[in-house]
Amino acid sequence: MGSLSKCGNSRSGTPDNFPIRANEEVVAQQEQERHENEILKQQNEELRLQNLAMKEFLKNPHKSIFEHKICIENARLKEKIHAMTIQYNQSYGLNETRMGIDMAIQTKSYLKLAPYAMDELFKLGALNDPLWNKSTHGQGETLDFKLYEWAFPPCLGPKPHGFVSEASRAKGVIPMATSDFVEALFNADRWRDMFGGMIGRCTTKVISNGARGSRNGALLLMKAEIQVFSSFVPVRVLNFIRYVNKHAEGLWVVVDYSVDFGTDRRLTRRCPSGCILQSMPNGCTKVTWIEHTEYDEQLIHENYRGLIRSGVGFGAQRWVSALLGQCKCIAPNLFESTTRCLRSLAQRMRRMFCATVCLTGWERWNLVANVPGRPRIMARMYNNFQGVSGVVMSATHSVWIAANHRHLFEMMLIKDLRSVWDVLCHTIATRDMYSFPLSQDEANFNCVSILDSNTLQAGVNQPLKVLQEASSDTTGSLIVYAIVDTPTVALVMQGGDSSRVGLLPIGLSIVPYHGESGESGSMVTVGFHRLLRNQVISNITVENINTLNRLVAQTVQGLKMLVDPLNEEGM
């Protein structure tokens, strides 16, 4: 049979692999036809929407073109969500074993809210005066709630009794492609790292990954902790849906809205918030950020209520400022291993400090002392990869300082003045050994540094170093630092893995103060860590507590003397 097959092929002049090639050509032709059909479908959909828009315009010519576009977009979104619901139900079924009835109904309710939240966010991004007014505190804009309530029906229902509203808008241009930014917003870890220190714990559940090959139509159920670096401001716990929509070519909208709010007054309700992203010819992305929340103001210390109400604490300007700072930091020297390692270690140090101040993250702390007007003392068990174990104690305290936050920040970075306020490291942090900026602006003091001195580590005869991150923007300033040894510095300089390096960060967070009577100044939060080797929490003594109280008091006194050398008051 083999010879017959061979003779037949040679007689006809057809090669042995003709069936394979023929199949490949058929498949290629089918793929081409499928691609052309998709293009025709898209063009047909665009023509259908244009036809619908023209009919609507003829019915009511008094409406503006923008209003007609909004109406058509809203209808399109409703159709899209309806299609998503059908697709989702076909995939999982309301009564399939892969998903319970309750979960399916809940998912359907999430989908139902999406077009309304998207429509509201898009309108809030497009409209200007008189709905938005320039903020009196820093940059950005604040919402006129009277006009808002008149123009927009409550997407999430009536505001909880006793809650107050806060809404702000800010804009910026980030050096990142729009598609990359959308992908980062879909990934919990990247989202948290992108907004350095603002986000504590974050968990996600994917409801839909979006259309094939993109995040268009993606839907996430998220829970996150959003924090201001002070023990006087409770962490904002948010349960929300994140919906991603490709509005047009180069234009994406990402909207968040609260779900499962319940009756817990500690939760913050997130009204339609998020960002409108527009691709730019140079590869950057123009971001319009909108943050709209409702919360119980009585849970916030009175010294911080003005800050939060103005939007500086949790508002859009802070999100945009954090994003700009992080993106500008990522861009230079991205492939330099030393810089990458140093930045990673500094990020972990900052995260540890923020988690201690705000009691977020995964560490469990035990309250040791919390007397009004005195530092809050906490403790937890500690065991690192080098075999060091014991108890870590922390002290956190917030105080008002009569100085602009930016001015105070810059004074603290003057090396000759460090001994005035730094009670532990002023003899170590005397000169820069290695430093890289967090901004390309030469007038900006934001940087990560390793500070050096001639002070030797006890018993080792090696000089101690200080790892420090300093950052500031219109919403506040932060200085975080920790003592590190010579082997750690060598590891960083070689671009090694620093994830196992033990850190006990010290830090100061400085935010603007907005008093009820127009007073200015700054609210400063001081945080310390101290390790008690080979100890347990039950063995903590009064002297251990007093030592931390003394460190905080001396730091606060130093800050007051920094801005007023004649000041001799304590905490």
What are the residue ranges of the model-derived segments?
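Intrinsically disordered, low-complexity regulatory regions of plant transcription factors
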Residues: 1-34, 55-79, 85-105
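Generic low-polarity alpha-helical segments
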Residues: 1, 16-23, 47, 323, ...
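Eukaryotic helix-grip
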Residues: 86, 94-571
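N-terminal amphipathic alpha-helical or helix-forming assembly modules
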Residues: 44, 51-54, 58-60, 289
